[in-house]
Amino acid sequence: MFVELVYDKRNVEGLPGAREIILNELTKRVHQLFPDAQVKVKPMQANALNSDCTKTEKERLHRMLEEMFEEADMWLVAE
């Protein structure tokens, strides 16, 4: 399975290392649900979640992603 998060890079302008921070957090959370998944992030000018998973698995991914960004103030910070 692969999981690719496409995110709007304009939302994290000014945050050094944003791509790596997002990739690390997403990988950690996806691997809790799907340990063998390949995880990628792609900074673009839109938001999307791409995967080759089933509809049920995609629903789980969307819930996880929503929770992840609701908690962004805890992990999406410059170190």
UniProtKB/Swiss-Prot annotation:
InterPro entries: DinI-like_sf, DNA_damage-inducible_DinI-like
Record-linked Pfam families: DinI
Top-level taxonomic group: Bacteria
The entry's keywords: Virulence
Homology family: Belongs to the DinI family.
Functional summary from the UniProt entry: Affects survival in macrophages.
Protein name: Virulence protein MsgA
Annotated source species: Salmonella typhimurium (strain LT2 / SGSC1412 / ATCC 700720)
Phylogenetic lineage: Bacteria, Pseudomonadati, Pseudomonadota, Gammaproteobacteria, Enterobacterales
Gene: msgA
